[in-house]
Amino acid sequence: MILLPAIDLMGGEVVRLRRGLATEKVVYSSDPVAFAKKWEDSGADWLHIVDLDAAFTGEPRNLDSVAKICAAVKIPCELGGGMRSEEKIQAAFDAGVARVILGTKACQSPETIAGFCAKFGGERIAVGIDANGGKVAVKGWTETTATVASDLALAAQKAGAGTIIYTDIATDGMLEGPNFAELEKMLSLLDCNLIASGGVSCDEDLKRLSLMPGLYGAIIGKALYDGRITGNLREIIAAA
């Protein structure tokens, strides 16, 4: 299982939101590169970067910071937030990211997933499925749709997306543990890579995730920033 520390960017700063609410924002740093290097040194396999300004508005606002992060680390980076057109996806790749994450666009126009996969390669396309009570939320989680999360996951896999990132909104930033039941359901449905996001609170959560058969990766956010998980990430899951 690969480990992906999260770097959420807003106005060029590293922030964390509780349940995706902009009103519940904590600013951790004005130096994203320093955190990127810190997580790389801690044993991260990838970095999971989200442009929150773009997620809320649809317009990328933090590509300069993203490019600096990609240039500063040796591990690959993925980027989500505002990836709603070929031009914006290409700009992300030009900034140095290895994989982009489709969210709102994938839900609102699932037929576009296959086109993006054909143009850029399915291994470079992830679909982020942010679930609120089993339904997909979009536009920075400000709107919950009627789309069933598992249906979108299957459609994305069929369209050629190499990776699905499943976020349980109710657990995100709450430090109460991942939604293991929903992850098991997703794993039973999918053959492509599945990354778990939301709720990781301690070493034991990481160990339990690492023991889930077929789980490709786990994103870690608030638990790292708040010091609930310390030490080398690889060593933590090796001890599982």
Predicted regions and their residues:
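Short, acidic/polar
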Residues: 28-40, 84-90, 145-155, 206
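C-terminal helical cap(s) of enzyme catalytic domains, especially alpha/beta-barrels
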Residues: 111-120, 187, 206, 210-240
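Structural preference for beta-strand elements that scaffold enzyme active sites
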Residues: 2-6, 46, 74-78, 98-101, ...
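Charged helix-capping and loop-helix junction motifs
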Residues: 60-67, 142-151, 176-184, 233-237
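Conserved anion-binding
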Residues: 11-12, 19-23, 90-93, 97-172
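Conserved, mostly hydrophobic/aromatic
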Residues: 8, 39, 47, 79, ...
